[in-house]
Design a protein with these regions (language model features):
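Flavin (FAD/FMN)-binding glycine-rich loop and adjacent Rossmann-like elements that form
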Residues: 1-266
Length: 269
């Protein structure tokens, strides 16, 4: 198990290793499932997690030191009081996504391909937990784990958050955007969603004000310029800048890098 400390004597527990808290292979039907079926899948995952922790806490085959350590922990008393102190919602890392005007891929993550119309940037590891468990030649094998470090931030294309023109003209999708499995594993982090959410909001305003609501007609360069100007003028010495100057400086360094990469990509076209 992977433990990450949190405030108020709490921790965030995550999967680690070949056999851990991930119920590998049991979520495949979730995207197309009915609400009733999703509830059944949720309960299966809940039973699996509870059972794993109970086994590690009580079974005498588990080393006493591990059992003693687990015995110190329990569900958070001040959270989800109407659901046994456990979240009623599964954490969905990845689900159905739009196929937009372009698809973000591994090549974009590694810098082999650079987009000319950035709407934001991403920089997290290409990350996927195992997706399946199989028996091969009498041996149990997990399949699908990906952990590939990304050296530099890369741009996310505006075309990846907007649908093809013949499908919709008033839709922008910053979360379930157009990306391959590998690329989405890098883009799907909350800080990246925050950047995309803000820039997509600005793009929506631009579409309404100047393009009769047609998102495909918006110039991503105009949006990114407004994004940079807005953050510089509205929060030049704000809370984040004063408490976390390194993070704030890195934020604008990434913004400048996004502009430079886009300029180079346009010149190469």
């Amino acid at each position: 198990l992977k433990w990450s400390k949190m405030p108020n004597s709490k921790c965030d527990m995550n999967n680690q290793g070949a056999f851990s808290t991930d119920m590998i292979g049991y979520s495949w039907s979730y995207p197309e499932a009915s609400y009733a079926e999703r509830e059944r899948i949720y309960k299966e995952h809940l039973d699996y997690t509870k059972g794993l922790l109970y086994f590690m806490w009580t079974d005498e085959r588990i080393p006493a030191s591990i059992r003693a350590d687990l015995a110190k922990w329990g569900w958070p008393r001040d959270e989800y009081e109407d659901n046994g102190h456990i979240t009623p919602q599964l954490y969905v890392r990845e689900s159905r996504r739009m196929v937009g005007r372009m698809v973000m891929t591994q090549a974009h993550c590694t810098g082999e391909s650079v987009v000319s119309d950035p709407i934001g940037w991403a920089d997290y590891t290409m990350d996927s937990h195992n997706c399946g468990r199989y028996v091969v030649n009498g041996m149990v094998k997990n399949e699908g784990d990906v952990q590939i470090y990304i050296k530099n931030p890369y741009n996310v294309s505006y075309r990846a958050v907007t649908p093809q023109a013949g499908e919709a003209r008033n839709l922008i999708v910053p979360v379930c955007l157009s990306a391959s499995h590998i690329a989405f594993g890098s883009i799907r982090m909350e800080p990246i969603y925050m950047v995309l959410g803000e820039t997509c909001g600005l793009a929506a305003v631009e579409a309404i004000d100047k393009h009769a609501g047609c998102v495909q007609d918006v110039d991503a360069g105009v949006v990114m310029s407004r994004f940079a100007e807005r953050d510089r003028t509205e929060n030049p010495t704000g809370d984040t800048a004063s408490r976390c100057p390194d993070i704030y400086d890195n934020y604008f360094a990434n913004l400048q890098r996004a502009k430079d990469l886009a300029t180079g990509a346009r010149q190469a076209e």
